[in-house]
């Protein structure tokens, strides 16, 4: 092989390697964009879950407050239970 052929072959190899590198860069950029979009989507989902969690906590607190309120009202009454024909009724005195 002559020197000219060797140089031409090396140039071709160099160009092929550069094309492959460019292709890899492009693929990496596409992957980075996909990852970025996925992260963005996950952040949005996380924020929605936080809001749902806060709403759930608020609902639970409201229910707890209602139960406590009902318990305090119930405890103000003295009650006796009378049984009549296998049924019972509560009589508040």
UniProtKB/Swiss-Prot annotation:
Keywords: Coiled coil
Coiled-coil stretches noted in the UniProt entry, renumbered to this chain: 2-58
Similarity comment: Belongs to the UPF0521 family.
The name this protein goes by in its record: UPF0521 protein B
UniProt source species: Dictyostelium discoideum (Social amoeba)
């Amino acid at each position: 092989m002559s020197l000219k052929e060797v140089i031409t072959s090396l140039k071709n190899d160099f160009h092929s390697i550069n094309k492959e590198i460019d292709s890899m860069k492009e693929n990496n950029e596409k992957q980075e964009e996909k990852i970025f979009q996925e992260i963005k989507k996950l952040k949005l989902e996380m924020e929605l879950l936080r809001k749902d969690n806060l709403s759930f906590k608020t609902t639970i607190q409201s229910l707890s407050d209602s139960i406590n309120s009902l318990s305090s009202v119930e405890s103000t009454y003295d009650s006796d239970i009378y049984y009549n024909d296998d049924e019972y009724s509560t009589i508040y005195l």
